[in-house]
Each structure stands twice: as structure tokens, then as C-alpha cells.
Amino acid sequence: MAMEKTFDAAEAEARITKAWEEAGAFKAGANRSRDESFTIMIPPPNVTGALHVGHAFNNTLQDILTRWHRMRGFDTLWQPGQDHAGIATQMQVEKMLAATQQPSRRELGREEFLKKVWEWKGQYGGTIVEQLKRLGASCDWSRNAFTMAGAAGDPRTGHENSPNFHDAVIKVFVDMYNKGLIYRGKRLVNWDPHFETAISDLEVENIEVAGHMWHFKYPLAGGATYTYVEKDEDGNIVLEEERDYISIATTRPETMLGDGAVAVHPSDERYAPIVGKLCEIPVGPKEHRRQIPIITDEYPDKNFGSGAVKITGAHDFNDYAVAKRGGIPLYRLMDTRGQMRADGAPYAAEAGKAQDYARGRAFTENEIDVINLVPDHLRGLDRFEARAKVVDEITSEGLAVMTVASDPRLGTTALKPGAEGADAIVPLVEAKPIMQPFGDRSKVVIEPMLTDQWFVDAEKVVGPALDAVRDGTVKIIPESGEKTYYHWLENIEPWCISRQLWWGHQIPVWYGPNRDDLGASYKAFCAASEQDALLLAQNYYGANVEVDFDSGPEELSGGIAFGTIEGPGGQKTLQSVSLTRDPDVLDTWFSSGLWPIGTLGWPEDTDEMRRYFPTSVLITGFDILFFWVARMMMMQLAVVDQVPFHTVYLHQLVRDEKGKKMSKTTGNVIDPLEIVDEFGADALRFTNASMAAIGGVLKLSKERITGYRNFTTKLWNAIRFAEMNEVFTDAVPQLSAAELAPKAAVNRWIIGETARVREEVDAALDSYRFNDAANALYAFVWGKVCDWYVELSKPLLQGEDTEAQAETRATMRWVMDQCLVLLHPIMPFITEELWGLTAERAKMLVHADWPTYKAADLVDDAADREMNWVISVIENTRSARAQMRVPAGLYVPMIVTEIDDHGQAAWDRNEALIKRLARIDSLTKADAMPKGCISIAAPGAAFGLPLAEIIDIGAEKDRLEKAKGKLAKELGGLRGRLNNPKFVESAPDEVVEEARENLAAREEEEARLNEALARLAELG
């Protein structure tokens, strides 16, 4: 049956995917012929996710390695699965409930809401799995894992064979808690007021917005004054005045209510006279105005603003560090919704306590935490409403720093100098862009918040993770990733692992009263199950105390239930206890940090753990090097004392063709499924591979994808040519490279070229140079095979020499098969289709044996020299004709003035071929090159084309000079921009890079024009 003229990717991809699945082609260990294993863990996409270009790129690289190793006989496992994506999934389900007018999360309650989440996951959670299959991802889909598998309510939909991941997560938490590696404490976290939960740094988007910086005066206590002196760089006094205040600048005036100190740099001489003294916070009821100390710390920059910084340790990460160093109280101002706190005693009483602490009275963390320093009239207000009122109150009292109305720092509100009112005195409120943290899902401003959370004591587990990279046990590619890795881990902070959500692994801790301090504090019982927690509690409280479980509040607010009896002396004795479970869940990064062992069945002693762990390589983005990669390193080493993988390959973000980040806002998002629909999966995959330079910028363009779609067409046509020339008939034997032994130079040459490219591809993939592998295959298949071998073989295939015909068919059959085999890891669909169409095969291409032949055994030097000579003559002749714009179909004479024996022999054996492909009608020998010829270079020979009578030299020269003049203007403009430091420093990176690329392209064009003009000069 003859091949179709074109490849129908849409029809073939679905059919081939089904055939692979039915054959179990991707199962762990499929096609195994050796003991070595190759394991790769998919970075689990969110269960809420849909395929984007980042997924498509990342999974293409993983699939290339997986298919390559599987064809080489490795015991191969590509482990798929999905992350339960706590906050994202909870948000999606809450949206669904609202859209369908169902009861809200709060109305449903925790248990019923989680049922809804599992239902949603069963209905929509498999979307990205099907999308990855469309890409050709050869994961063992029968092993699809899920990071919440085995948790309460799991119906096992979509992850039927997943190991019990939940039990593994809980066991690790309990074990680490018992080893003192996990603790509950109060620290500053990123708080999302919309979702009312802590979030990770990765879930925070820092966006530049138009902001303001207010300048305020903090009066010195008791009306004290000091001499304020400013000096220039040479030490000359430029300002000297008496002041009774210290000025600060802030972008968040509402947080002034929680100030614990004002800090200045130890070397800042301006404030030396008042260090250690008290100043007054300029907000709140005057009669209860708080005073705070002026301290020194290395944090303030004396050259920025006034050099003095307010320290609000409970609402700023930098201030938190200063407060911790200086023993400054951390006053919490807001509730979980981002509103000013409304709890606690009246402001007057609370301010009095805080004043005592500022004057040196000792305090505990709990004593500080309950104090509410929000004035009564501001309590319950939204934080931004409170900001406006604080600014108004300070300004009304005359404690704002003032300036003239023409001060340019005022931004667009500044009046022009000399304008009416320009000299008026107004509050100094700088208009300036500021980086504002937003929740990536809620889109609300994130608040640094001091809350009780669970933490991993990262300092205790980071050492082995650092050592594993330092000693080479784990290699990070590119090497620049190692520096980033060291930076993060050498400066590691406690890792917040709790989230105030319902969807996730609920923290396995139950609380009861502290038997030694009833009603004042908790006793925590960490256990893998309720039964284990009960045993711990019974052992703690004793046999005389009845212990049961309370369903518990949805937020732990101190409502621990217990009963007592009073003894004869009035002492209280515990009689009953109801344990309450911690309502928080674990951060998804904690569970995904166990992805390698959790998916292989740990803590059970499984065959998979023995065969596939540690894994071979992890392919992931630079952006989660710390959040996921480093934490997997720490977790696996802490839990099983082994590294999770031997190599980490990091890649950049996939950007658009101009290097810009893709976003819906800018409208430059490329949907990979739309690309697959339009161009086929193979074109997208080859594009991904070709741009995967180690550490390189990833620019995806439809133009590039179109080019590789054309490559699939070229391959199809080459195989179709071979089929039409009876290459794949039963009469043509399927021989190995060693068995072919052809006589024709062209056949010996292409066998050697095939061996060379096999070695190039293996070397490239072995060192993760995916782009080099793709580019080598492209150059070989399109350039060597399609452009040259197919053309050079035509005289042999269509001639009357039956022996030459037979050897050429056998050679071409082998070469075409090798093209399919070598291309398969990158372009699996079209190669599998052609493999099946061209012959009866013992097995599918996905399980074909990867070749091991060597160039040293197959390269024929004589054939190489001859065919490379022939190709150079044809290529150089074609290039000269194109430059001189000789009509494509016109045959022209050629002159030769010298040629060595090798060249003459090559010409004699290939004359007809050279003349046909170079459009030469005759070859004439001459002692010297006649006037009007352009030279054609060839090894050991000097050829020329007499073109003076064929082209209009004058018109052609004018055309080229005109083009060169136009180009010179473009080059001048580009060079001017790139030589301008302001442009290079201030323009967006992608704009500068685009200008550099344009300059390089124009310079290449200039070189071509100069070459063409030089050739014209030869013609006279």
C-alpha cells in the first residue's frame, strides 16, 4: 500500500498513543535488557492545572531522555503524578460552589467540603494527564501518583495504583517532630488576607506599583533637643540646626501603631547624641502617646532618606530581624482578614503596658502577642482605611515633614517652580514606584504577619544537602545553579510548613491541657493516628483521667475542653480531657518534598524503591530550585539518608519570541495544545529540544515551530521517495551497517555520516545538550540525507546497473531506518508512523534497539573525501549563481584552470551528477581564467563561471550598492543605540537582546553584500 502524500498528525497521534498504551510500551521496565536503571520523576503539575508552554518544554526533555534510555535497554521508569495544590484547589472548589449556588465552604463544614473537593478532583483532575499524553509523554501512566493519595475520603479516582502518599507524609512529620526537627512557634510569614493563610515566597508576586512614601516627625521624649548636623562628602557642614524630633519615612503609615523602636546606623554621627533616648510615636490619643527607644543596628542605610528607620517587627521582614537582634517587642496590629485588630483591652490600658516594656520591663512573647496597640477609634477598620486616618491625624497635629509645593519628589502633584503657590509649604509625600507584594491567586496585597505556625528547623537538616552538592554526589546543571543553591541553603531560615486551609494533609497533632498549668497552656501529642494520639495522652494524663476526642474548632482558638474535680484542700485534679486536633494542613511543598520516595511506596520496603531509588535526573525550572529541589534534598537525606537524584538539570522560563515573559495581560501567551493542533506534537517537541541550550534563554516562536513542521514534511517526503523507489520491498534485505559493504562512494559516505551523527546524538544527550542533539539530527536528516544523499543516489537507483541499484536500496533502507530510530526520542509520532508503514517490524519503534555502531568502524576516508569534494563544488557553484542572480533553470558553462588528480577522478566519476545539480552545461579547460569569470573554490581545483554575458553587471552592482546604503543606515541606528549606556542599562532586557540580534543579522547581511560586490568586481 502506497504512502499518503502527507502526514495527518491529528489522526496519527491519537491512534499511535492508543497503540503504545495497549502495548504497555511505557510501563516500568518495558524493553529492559540490562541491569542499570534510569528513573526520572515528573515535577508533579497541580491537579488544577492545564498544560502550558513550560510544562510542554520540561516534559519534552524528560521524554527524550526516557525514550532514549528505554531504547538502550535500561530498566526505565518515568514516574507521573500530580500535586494536590492546596490553596489552588480549595480556591477552585469554592469558586465552583459559588457559581453553582451551593452552600459555601463555611456553611458546609470541613468534612462535607472535603467531599466536594474529592468529587471535583475526580471530575477535573485528569485534564493535564490527557494533555501530556497528547504531547507524547511516555510516563508509566498505570502508576499515576497523587500527593493526597490515601488521605481520608480518597475515592482513588485517577490515581488508582498510587502508593499511599498520605501515610508517608504523616510518618515523616511524626518522625521529624520526635527528632526535634519540627516545632511550632511564632514567626513572621507571608499572610494572604483573602484566603486567611500563610503562603510561600513563591506564591507572592512582587509588582511595581505607583506608591507613596510619607515623611513624619517622631518628637523626642520630654521635649529634648539635639544639634542635627549634615556634612558633605568632604566633611564640610552643609546643615546645622536644633531639632526636637527624628524623622522617618514609611510607605505603610498604619504600621506605625506597632513600632517598637527607631533604628539608625551605628556610624551615623547625625543621631549619635540621641541614641538610647526615647522618642514619641506621633499617632494615637495624645494622653496615651507611646514612647519607643532610638537604637543602633547595621540595617539602616544612612544615605537613604533620613537614615532613620521605624522598626515594626510584627509587620516587616527586615524589621523582624532587627527586632530579634535588639530584643524589641513585636506588636501585632491586624487580624487574619487584614483588618485592624478589635480584640483585647482598651487602648489606654494596652498602651500603658507597652510603655512599661519600652522603659525596660521584662516581657514574654505571649504577653506581647495579646497586646492590641490599635487606638479604639481605628479598631476593626480595613488596613488601608486605617492608613488614611493615621496620615490625616499626624498631618493635622503638625508632625508631617513639610516641603515646598514645587518639590519634584511630590511627583505629578508638584507645581512648576515659579507657578502660583509653588512656594507653599505642604506635607512631604513622595510619589515613587514601590514593589508591592500580591498573592498570586488572591491578587490582594500580602501582609507580613506574626502568627503561630509549624516550622522545619532547616538549619538542622541542611548540612547533608549542602555536602551532597559540594562533594559531587549530586551535580547541578548549569553550574551557575550551584551558586544559587549554596546561597539559599547557607542562609536558610526556618521553613514554615503549616497552612490555614482545609484541603491538604492535616497536621497530625492533637492538643490537650498542660497538666502542670491547667487552662494556661497546651500539651501537644504528635502521632500518626488518633489511636496513637490517644495512647500518648493516656500515658501522659494517667489511668485516672478519661481521654476522648473533640471534633474541634475549625481554627484553634484556645478552646481546649477538660474537666476537673476539687480536692479537700481546694486543689484541682484532672478528671477528663477532650483532645482537639490542629486544624491546619501541611504546605504542599512539604508533601511534594517527599515525591521521590513517596511515589515508590516508601515507607514500605518495595521492589520499586530498590530498583529506582535514588532517581537518575530531575529536570525542572530554576524558579523552584530552593522551594522544591533543595527541600527534596533535605527531606530525602533526613528520612532515608540518601540523595533523591544524581543530577539536577535546571532550565529558564519559556518566553515569547522577543524574550518577554508570557502573560494574559500582554496577550503573548502561546497555548501548546493549539500548537499541537496546528503543527503537530513533533514540531513542538523538536522546537523545544532545539532551544534547550544549557542555561540559555528560551524563546518560543511560531515561525520556529513552522520551520520544524516543515522538517517533518521533509522527512515524510524522503521516506516516501525511498518507498517509491522500492527501498522497503521484501526483495531488499534488512542488513546491519557491517553487512552492507557497498561499493559506491555515495553509499559508503552516507553510512559513515550516519555513524558520526549517532555518536554526536549520544554524546549530546549524555551531557544534557538537547539542542546539540536536535541540531545534529536536523543537519544530518535534512542536509546530508534529504538534500544530498537522496539526490546523489538517484542516478544509481534509476540507472541500469542492477548491482548498484541493489546496494543503494539496501543502504538507503538502513539509512532511513536509522533516521527514524535516532529521531524517535525527539519526534516520536511521525517516526513511529513511518516505522510501521514501511515494513513488517518485530516490534514498535518505541522499543527498537538503539544503535551502537562506531564512526571509527564505518567512516570510509576515500568516500568521504570524494563526496565532500563533489558537494563543495555543487554548493559553491549554487551559492555563486544565487549571489549573481543567475536564473535558476539556466545551464551555464564552467571553466577549470587547474585540478589535481583526486579532483579529476572525483569529477570523472560524478560529472553527470555535478552538471545536473549545479546547472552546468559544459566544462572547458583553460590556462588562465578569462575576463568576465567569477571564481568557484574547490579543494585542489580552480573553477570559474563566465557570467559577463549572462547578467547585467551594472544594474546588479547598482542594486547591491543601494541595498548596502539602506543597510548602513540601519546598522548606524542599531550601533548607536547599543553604544549608548543609558539604553543598555535602562531598556528592558528583551529589547536590548532584540537589538543585539538585529545587529548581528544585519552585519551578516552586510558581509553577504560585500562578498557579492567582490564577485561582481571579478567580472570587470
UniProtKB/Swiss-Prot annotation:
CDD domains, per database record: Anticodon_Ia_Val
The protein's role, per its UniProt record: Catalyzes the attachment of valine to tRNA(Val). As ValRS can inadvertently accommodate and process structurally similar amino acids such as threonine, to avoid such errors, it has a 'posttransfer' editing activity that hydrolyzes mischarged Thr-tRNA(Val) in a tRNA-dependent manner.
PROSITE patterns noted in UniProt: AA_TRNA_LIGASE_I
Subcellular location: Cytoplasm
Residues noted as binding ATP in the record, renumbered to the chain: 664
Reaction(s) the record says it catalyses: tRNA(Val) + L-valine + ATP = L-valyl-tRNA(Val) + AMP + diphosphate
Coiled coil: 955-1020
Record protein name field: Valine--tRNA ligase
UniProt organism field: Ruegeria pomeroyi (strain ATCC 700808 / DSM 15171 / DSS-3) (Silicibacter pomeroyi)
GO CC annotations, alphabetized: cytosol
Alphabetically ordered keywords of this record: Aminoacyl-tRNA synthetase, ATP-binding, Coiled coil, Cytoplasm, Ligase, Nucleotide-binding, Protein biosynthesis
Motif position, 'HIGH' region: 45-55
